[in-house]
């Protein structure tokens, strides 16, 4: 992938448009339009973004749509798609309403409207349906947030995922806990694992168990629950307290993970830490406001935007300045997804979806989320360099703490729940 695509991540954020034009080695028309490197006459290139803009997940969905637009603006402010004569990138959004059926129909609509690629969708069930539509129509689909392993186990050729899948997050979460314990000099011999019993929670648990076995960590007790029905976690946390586990690991959504934290505050088990794994609460600013004692000391091993990356920080600042609220990691992943698509269009020099698909498969985009290297897709479409980072609530702020080379502050471990 060329230098121009890599630099786009900062374009429109740090005002690098003129530098980009010089570095790309080609003249760029700010107005867009012209003849492509393949002889196409193109003024605009349409891509589609599918997210829940209404419904219970609308807060995330709207942020993701906003970030997609910021990415498109950055590309266009840097001169558009140079290999297509400076053509403008145009974004059309689709509201999945948080349901797979609506997501499927919206994906079909966007493709019929001429979208040459899709990004989305925040929810695995919806992404599974969109992936099927993308495959049938041979239009590339880059998933920003969708953890379910099975989506990419269908032999699809047109679907790609940026984030780590659920089982990989479980594996990396266990490895991170073991490494943190070793680094701190505080042994962790036994972990209690509490997880929501759906496909996501089960996959995270299975990955965690496998990696914990390799690290010599006993996982016991293992407790599952129905995230849609649970209203109190006192019984489950009492079981954890009776087990003598050193650490409680939790893989759940926001509401149920908050219930677990409330039960920990009530039962007060003797723990070295509460350690979220791909957790939907413990790295969220809202958790600090909602949790007992502000959730002080809670960890989460999860994908997250990289606070040590200047371009990521610049995007976060631009987002808050533009929309009046802090950016969420889901939105940064959407920004990355659009940049991968834009870079592929640039590389392909074509609006042919199959040519764009081939360029996506060969991308080496440097993401703004924490990663083990440039985006690199395997034959299933999974980003093999997707990774997690450990966050911790410190002094009423979610802070990036481990591994040490990515830390914005030293971790605190042991960290008894609620202790300052």
Predicted regions and their residues:
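Segments of small-molecule ligand-sensing domains
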Residues: 321, 327-328, 343-398
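Signal peptide-proximal N-terminal region
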Residues: 45, 67-91, 214-217
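Extracytoplasmic "Venus flytrap"
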Residues: 32, 38-44, 48-69, 94-101, ...
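Beta-alpha junction/loop-to-helix N-cap segments that form part of ligand/metal-binding clefts
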Residues: 33-35, 59-63, 81-153, 162, ...
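Extracellular/periplasmic periplasmic-binding protein-like sensory domains
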Residues: 264-335, 404-419
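Periplasmic-binding protein-like
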Residues: 49, 110-123, 142-144, 190-194, ...
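Short, low-complexity disordered leader/linker segments with a strong preference
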Residues: 1-46, 77, 417-420
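Extracellular/periplasmic Venus flytrap/periplasmic-binding protein
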Residues: 105, 150, 157-267, 306-310, ...
